[in-house]
Amino acid sequence: MIMRFGYVSHAMALWDCSPAKTITFTSFQKLSKQEREDKLYDVTKQNLEHTLRILHYNIAHEIPLYRLSSSIVPLATHPEVEFDYIGAFTPLWRKIGALIKEHNLRISFHPNQFTLFTSDKPHITTNAITDMTYHYKVLDAIGIADSSYINIHVGGAYGNKEKAIERFHENIKKLPAHIKKQMTLENDDKTYTTAETLSICQKEKIPFVFDYHHHMANLCEEPLEELLPAIFETWSHTNIVPKVHISSPKSKKEFRAHAEYIDLEFIKPFLHVAKKINHNFDIMIESKQKDLAMLQFIQELSSIRGIKRISSSTLQW
């Protein structure tokens, strides 16, 4: 069983390398037309250059997974902001894409919790489609839209989970098919359990990104031993291995909050279930210390008998 690792957005080991520098709309409004264009251009350019730095760092550390920042283009989906963020940076997008393809990196996006398809308000669905389209356009500009995924949560329950799930199935039809083909769903820590998310994924033929921390915060009746094989099966129509999210609680009191690093004892039960299935899968680390937490966790895991480190960020068990 091969386990490959990655982390989210910011490389903590790199100085001043945020790929998510931004400008608020309030500040944006105060600028002249030329100043607005210059500011959007400068901030986006810096984010793309920082993304390139991070990718080089990942390659040097043999880190095969990476989640791009959704804030790579500031104010990209704001209705009052017009900015050709694709055409203005074609060489940089292509440079990023060439690096990703040359080193076979697995890239993803994770829009925020407001991108959902369970609302009864049409404008919420419209905004979700706009946001998904933005993420897809970035992946397309990079040249990896057919091999990368945009991960979201199911959404809210709005007092009636059954009705909300029905709305999800209806609203998702409005998302263009080529974008839906590149989306994944994740179980959340309060509303939609692993079993509920799995059912939706199976019906819509959407790959399921399983989050173990969320699962433990929002347990369902079905045991993980039954759920995990079915979760992995949702990836069978793709040409890539399943991906899971790993983090551990900040404390018992703040169970849903992410800790700085990974608590191996918290994760062990999941790993033992995964080992019984013996299916290759990828792990996205969602701890606060990102790449540092990931490398420390890999080091801890590699000291366990039977687990072999075959590269800086890949283990065999």
From Swiss-Prot:
Parts forming coiled coils: none
An example Gene Ontology molecular-function term: endonuclease activity
GO biological process: nucleotide-excision repair; pyrimidine dimer repair; response to UV
Protein's job: Component in a DNA repair pathway. Removal of UV LIGHT damaged nucleotides. Recognizes pyrimidine dimers and cleave a phosphodiester bond immediately 5' to the lesion.
Full protein name: UV DNA damage endonuclease
Enzyme class, spelled out: hydrolase
Name of the gene encoding the protein in the UniProt record: uvsE
Enzyme Commission number(s): 3.-.-.-
Pfam families: UvdE
Keyword Hydrolase listed: yes
Keyword DNA damage: yes
Domain of life: Bacteria
UniProt keyword annotations, A-Z: DNA damage, DNA excision, DNA repair, Endonuclease, Hydrolase, Nuclease
Family: Belongs to the uve1/UvsE family.
